[in-house]
């Protein structure tokens, strides 16, 4: 019979300071402080994954010693997260959120909002551009010297058309809203009209996105992820690092487990 494996997770909504969690990881996994911190910025509140019963007990005991709320769940019991409904338009007040999904309008109660999770995800695209390059000063000087020496009118060089690869870096802002009935709505700031902000709507999608987040914070008692707290607390960078959307979803899973534990 295969031995059970466990996931250890922080069971409170807001993560403790990472340096506190790092002390647990240092002792449990025999890591130096830097290694523990590097692990934590990509673990999204999980302190152990697929660990055996003895390691589970060790990590939970260390958390208890440091007054860190933590719990475990077996690999087999991990819940599945619902597929996202990506929306481009919505309207809401303190009671109801109405959104459009495939030309159909759906409404859902704000009081049933359980998880709010935000992540800034950097994307890098490469495109080819045509550019005209003029002869540089060295080339011009050499050709001028040849003309003076030989009296042959070879000119100072011609413009050249070259094709170069240019890297473009962009940041996409994602916001997931998870409700009691498992509905998971996703907003991409670059593809959302923000008309729900009415007179507060600005030209900048980043400003609009932040205003939307603040309004949701005021309307809801939902659990919020680390990056959402960073945003509303005015931090310039996020505590955790999000390379792709699956990182955000991993943190959402941790919040779902914590919410279930504390319900």
Language-model-detected regions and their locations in the chain:
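Anionic N-terminal interaction surfaces
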Residues: 49-90
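Long, compositionally biased, phosphorylation-prone intrinsically disordered terminal regions
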Residues: 78-85, 120-125, 224, 228-240
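Small-residue helix-packing motif on alpha-helices
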Residues: 32-36, 56
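Extended, charged low-complexity segments
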Residues: 151-263
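C-terminal alpha-helical interaction appendages
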Residues: 1-27, 54-60, 64
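Surface-exposed aromatic
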Residues: 40-47
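Phosphoinositide-dependent membrane-docking surfaces
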Residues: 93-99, 105-129
């Amino acid at each position: 019979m295969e031995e059970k494996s466990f996931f250890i997770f922080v069971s409170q909504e807001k993560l403790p300071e990472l340096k506190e969690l790092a002390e647990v990881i240092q002792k449990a996994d025999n890591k130096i402080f830097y290694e523990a911190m590097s692990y934590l910025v990509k673990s999204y509140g999980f302190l152990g994954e697929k660990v055996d019963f003895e390691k589970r007990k060790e990590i939970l005991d260390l958390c208890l010693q440091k007054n860190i709320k933590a719990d475990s769940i077996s690999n087999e019991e991990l819940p599945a997260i619902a597929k996202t409904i990506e929306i481009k338009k919505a309207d809401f007040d303190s009671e109801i959120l109405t959104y459009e999904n495939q030309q159909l309008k759906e409404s859902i109660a704000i009081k049933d909002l359980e998880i709010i999770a935000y992540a800034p995800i950097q994307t890098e695209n490469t495109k080819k551009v045509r550019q005209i390059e003029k002869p540089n000063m060295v080339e011009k000087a050499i050709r001028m010297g040849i003309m003076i020496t030989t009296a042959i009118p070879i000119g100072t060089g011609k413009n050249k058309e070259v094709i170069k690869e240019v890297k473009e870096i962009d940041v996409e802002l994602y916001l997931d809203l998870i409700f009691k009935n498992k509905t998971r709505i996703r907003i991409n700031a670059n593809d959302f009209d923000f008309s729900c902000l009415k007179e507060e709507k600005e030209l900048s999608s980043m400003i609009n996105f932040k205003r939307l987040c603040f309004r949701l914070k005021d309307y809801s008692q939902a659990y919020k992820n680390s990056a959402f707290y960073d945003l509303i607390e005015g931090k310039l960078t996020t505590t955790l690092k999000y390379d792709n959307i699956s990182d955000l979803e991993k943190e959402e899973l941790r919040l779902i487990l914590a919410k279930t534990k504390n319900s």
